């Protein structure tokens, strides 16, 4: 399914009108502000697993190394396999939301592929030229976002572990403080850093390309799901049975609505090494 992430338009720069009383009696020539619709797509995530009748009959028993306190085999292998597959799918979704390469299906045998943040953010980008992540790089990105009419309040900086270390080292070297996790957003606990452009929250993330950091406006981001009537989304169902076993599939469709892409920013080319200070 294709969905809209935003309607973009330009109103031009600020200017002072010079309209006399006489001129105001005649309406000016009409102009038209064009809009451009931006879209993304949901895509399919699907996993299958099979369980033999022999495995089902082995539920709750002990196997493997005989150690005191050993946990028995899962009581219901179906529930265990379902949970494990859902964990994998959740990580695949997170990877896609960050790194996904856009593709719109043109036929039933062509896959929809949801666009991720790396490929969505094009307006506010900053090349670090192998510099480590520091306060002024973050502030410079926020300045660029502000100059491009993006809100800079409540932003969240999504970083990998190396960049988080670099940022903490820079803050320490300059007598600054990164406030420990004190804010909850959709169940996510966030740290914060005060810059000349305002406060920005910090979140350690996975699947971020090396040398990359994101400044995200979480208020305009949400997952878009496609619900299968009578089944929901990311549901488990049994497939046709063959032999002494059972086969199941987990099926779901989801994509990322990142909102107006210029509401976000991205730094690339950061140093991928961290050298502790003395």
Question: Which residues fall in each region the model found?
Answer:
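Flexible, glycine/threonine- and acidic-rich loop/arm segments that mediate assembly and lattice contacts
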Residues: 1-201, 205-278
């Amino acid at each position: 399914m294709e969905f809209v992430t935003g309607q973009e338009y330009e109103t031009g720069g600020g200017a002072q009108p010079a309209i006399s009383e006489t001129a105001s009696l005649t309406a000016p020539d009409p102009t038209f502000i064009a809009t451009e619709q931006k879209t993304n797509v949901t895509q399919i995530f699907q996993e299958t697993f099979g369980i033999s009748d022999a495995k089902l009959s082995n539920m709750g028993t002990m196997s493997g190394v005989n150690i005191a306190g050993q946990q028995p085999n899962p009581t219901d292998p179906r529930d265990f396999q379902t949970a494990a597959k859902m964990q994998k799918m959740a990580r695949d979704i997170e990877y896609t939301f960050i790194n996904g390469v856009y593709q719109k299906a043109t036929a039933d045998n062509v896959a929809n592929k949801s666009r991720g943040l790396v490929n969505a953010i094009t307006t506010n980008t900053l090349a670090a030229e192998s510099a480590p992540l520091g306060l002024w790089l973050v502030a410079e990105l926020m300045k660029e976002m502000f100059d491009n009419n993006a809100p800079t309040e409540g932003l969240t900086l999504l970083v990998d572990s190396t960049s988080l270390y670099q940022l903490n080292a820079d803050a320490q070297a300059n007598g600054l403080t990164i406030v420990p996790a004190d804010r909850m957003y959709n169940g996510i606990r966030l740290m914060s850093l005060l810059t000349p452009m305002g406060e920005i929250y910090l979140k350690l993330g996975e699947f971020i390309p090396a040398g990359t950091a994101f400044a995200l406006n979480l208020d305009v981001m949400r997952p878009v799901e496609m619900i299968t009537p009578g089944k929901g989304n990311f549901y488990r169902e049994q497939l046709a049975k063959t032999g002494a076993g059972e086969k199941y599939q987990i099926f779901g469709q989801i994509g990322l609505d990142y909102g107006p892409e210029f509401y976000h920013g991205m730094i690339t080319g950061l140093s991928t090494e961290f050298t502790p200070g003395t």
